[in-house]
Amino acid sequence: MVHELAQVNIARLSAPLESEQLADFVAALDEVNAEAEAAPGFRWRLADDSGNATGIPAFQWDVADSVGVIVNMSTWASVEALRDYMYGGRHVEMLRRRREWFHKVAEATTALWWVPAGHEPTNLESDDPLRYVREHGPTPHAFT
């Protein structure tokens, strides 16, 4: 069976999405998402009717002292394809600025796992790999 890499990444917001503090983040979403979709090895990403996933309720168990949690989930042909996208182009600029928009979290906020090719993971399904990495650390079941 052929597999693809699934990734889930959550972030605790430091301010509401509508706030001035997050204006640059929100303004960049369409461009960053389009860049992902055009990247070699990209397969699928979680999105609602707005074209992004910021309005999709997920991981509410992890809100803690933040105003909310946002989720990013996608599938890729390989670890290398995801890495090349994450650390290149506009996305790496967003990574550099993440402390302006999100709380620093001690626990893992990202999990990777293998899914059958063409499978689109659900929010509920992505909950397990993230909790697993937090409890057990990276293993072949779920890793970072």
Regions found by a protein language model. Name each.
Residues 1-69, 106-144:
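Short S/T/G/P-rich N-terminal loop/turn motif that feeds into the first structured element of a domain
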Residues 19, 66-68, 79-108:
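An amphipathic, aromatic/His-enriched active-site/gating alpha helix that lines ligand/cofactor pockets
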Residues 51-53, 77-82:
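Short, charged/polar surface micro-motifs in flexible loops or helix N-caps
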Residues 72-75:
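Generic transmembrane alpha-helix motif of multi-pass integral membrane proteins
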